[in-house]
């Protein structure tokens, strides 16, 4: 359903997306995992014909994204990262305007709107003005709008960004429902590890380069071993470094990857490391990302523009 061949985007000499090649099968939920600035949104903009690529090629639903852009647009739906509803209109009016843009007749539009609103459990508020909606309700309405014209492929750019964990889980129920009920192909960008876990396959993107594509389980299995977590105190950092025990800082913890858990813990005790609160776990997607890129995903997301956009988004979601 989606295929790219060395897809590239440059902005004034800066390479935002660097010769990215991958494919997404029909009915697949494909997750694009990476921090802000990794090239996720730029890739979506190229695939949805909003931005012409600087190089390479891409196909969506069998159509070239450059030479057959109209055919691509007819077959896709988009849920943008930033809110794009007209908050002065009602839920029904927002969807009806979308139906007009896609040439859906009035009678057919009414039936589709009723079905879409029922799908995301908003039929009871269909005549309420959107500015009265919570952030989660607005996101559900955007999902309904994105699927109103029954696209073959639905692109979701950070669909739960700015939402609380409980609301994120609810939104994910609707996303999975689209795949299971309608068999739609889903291309989703995220920097939330728990969301990437729901994907059939994940593409890890870092600084514009596609590092790896595989299932979540295969990515974790390939890393191998176990992870020992202990408190990231200055004393622990110094003692592990002096003993040549490699550790990566992750939030308030030091993570030591090892194939020999018992031997490594014994060595930590011998060097006098603080073992209070120590835990042992199997590799996570966070560990995979760190191993492949050298940094935690949160450490890559602090550019000023991204922070400003996040603040604006949070205000709109309230």
Set out the residue ranges of the language-model regions.
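ABC transporter nucleotide-binding domain
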Residues: 173-259, 279
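Catalytic Walker B motif of ABC-type/P-loop ATPase nucleotide-binding domains
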Residues: 154-157
């Amino acid at each position: 359903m989606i295929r790219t061949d060395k897809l590239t985007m440059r902005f004034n000499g800066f390479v935002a997306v660097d010769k990215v090649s991958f494919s997404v099968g029909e009915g697949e939920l494909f997750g694009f995992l990476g921090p802000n600035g990794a090239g996720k949104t730029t890739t979506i903009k190229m695939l949805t014909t909003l931005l012409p690529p600087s190089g390479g090629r891409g196909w969506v639903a069998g159509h070239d994204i450059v030479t057959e852009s109209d055919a691509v647009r007819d077959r896709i739906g988009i849920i943008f990262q930033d809110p794009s509803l007209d908050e002065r209109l009602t839920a029904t009016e927002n969807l009806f305007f979308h139906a007009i843009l896609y040439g859906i007749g009035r009678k057919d539009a009414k039936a589709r709107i009723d079905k879409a609103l029922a799908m995301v459990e908003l039929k009871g508020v269909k005549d309420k003005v959107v500015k009265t909606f919570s952030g989660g309700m607005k996101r559900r309405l955007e999902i309904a709008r994105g699927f109103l014209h029954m696209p073959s492929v639905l692109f979701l750019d950070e669909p739960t960004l700015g939402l609380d964990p409980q609301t994120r889980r609810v939104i994910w129920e609707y996303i999975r429902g689209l795949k299971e009920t309608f068999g739609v192909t889903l291309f989703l960008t995220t920097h939330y590890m728990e969301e990437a876990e729901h994907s059939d396959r994940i593409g890890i993107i870092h600084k514009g380069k596609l590092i790896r594509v595989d299932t979540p389980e295969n990515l974790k299995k390939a890393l191998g071993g176990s992870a020992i977590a202990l408190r990231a105190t200055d004393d622990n950092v110094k003692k592990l470094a002096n003993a040549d025990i490699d550790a990566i800082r992750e939030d308030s913890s030091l993570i030591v990857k090892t194939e020999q858990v018992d031997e490594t813990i014994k060595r930590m005790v011998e060097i006098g490391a603080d073992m209070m609160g120590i835990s042992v776990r199997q590799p996570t997607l966070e560990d995979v990302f760190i191993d492949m890129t050298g940094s935690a995903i949160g450490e890559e997301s602090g550019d000023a523009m991204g922070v400003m956009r996040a603040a604006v988004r949070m205000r709109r979601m309230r």
